[in-house]
Amino acid sequence: MPVQPPSKDTEEMEAEGDSAAEMNGEEEESEEERSGSQTESEEESSEMDEEDCERRRSECVSEMMDLEKQFSELKEKLFRERLSQLRVRLEEVGAERAPEYTEPLGGLQRSLKIRIQVAGIYKGFCLDVIRNKYECELQGAKQHLESEKLLLYDTLQGELQERIQRLEEDRQSLDISSEWWDDKLHARGSSRTWDSLPPNKRKKAPLVSGPYIVYMLQEIDILEDWTAIKKARAAVSPQKRKSDGP
């Protein structure tokens, strides 16, 4: 068989393949060039970034130092202002002109007035209670005195009546004994009786003062002794009558 010549389409396809290979080669070369330029630019930019960072760091440090200095100055200024304000307030308080002092002081003065009024009212009530208690005690003391006076009067009256009664009994016993002696004298036949004697010849009873110890006794003791003696004499007289009889 005779050899056929290549067709036109086949040639075109080969030509396109060659052109594509050439284009790919060119593209690879351009990419290599771009990558090289990028690495160079990155190195340059890294060097610039380090310098810029160092410069910015130094600027930040200087700014920070300036800020710290300003802050310390402001703090010192604020401290001086606060100190001066406190001194002024202290002077106002010492002069009793500060509102922090005058307002509580006014409240304390008002409460003081109220407490003084309450204390005055309480004092009045206490004085009334004491006055009433004093009047009650005084009235009770007067009533007690009157009752004691009446009791003492009744006691003394009873004692005096008892003494009077004893004296009456003693007088009656003396009268009885004197009559007995008169009867005895008449029974013996005495010619001279007590009544027949003239008054100038009658023997008077001697006035003899008792021993000193008698006057040292109380009156009630003397009366009791005297009554006991008279009763003893009255008891002895009937025994003498019996002995004198037949």
UniProtKB/Swiss-Prot annotation:
Residues 11-32, 40-52 have a biased composition (Acidic residues). GO terms for biological process: apoptotic process; negative regulation of DNA-templated transcription; negative regulation of NF-kappaB transcription factor activity; negative regulation of transcription by RNA polymerase II; positive regulation of anoikis; positive regulation of protein deacetylation; regulation of apoptotic process. InterPro entries: Sds3. Residues 1-58 are annotated as: Disordered. It is found in: Nucleus; Cytoplasm. GO terms for cellular component: cytoplasm; nucleus; Sin3-type complex. GO terms for molecular function: histone deacetylase binding. There is a cross-link at residues 184, 242 (Glycyl lysine isopeptide (Lys-Gly) (interchain with G-Cter in SUMO2)). Keywords: Apoptosis, Cytoplasm, Isopeptide bond, Nucleus, Repressor, Transcription, Transcription regulation, Tumor suppressor, Ubl conjugation. SMART domains: Sds3 (SM01401). Coiled coil: none annotated. Transcriptional repressor. Down-regulates transcription activation by NF-kappa-B by promoting the deacetylation of RELA at 'Lys-310'. Promotes HDAC1 binding to promoter regions. Down-regulates expression of anti-apoptotic genes that are controlled by NF-kappa-B. Promotes apoptosis in cells that have inadequate adherence to a substrate, a process called anoikis, and may thereby inhibit metastasis. Belongs to the BRMS1 family. Interacts with SNX6, HDAC1 and RELA. Interacts with ARID4A. Identified in mSin3A corepressor complexes together with SIN3A, SIN3B, RBBP4, RBBP7, SAP30, SUDS3, ARID4A, HDAC1 and HDAC2. This is Breast cancer metastasis-suppressor 1 homolog.
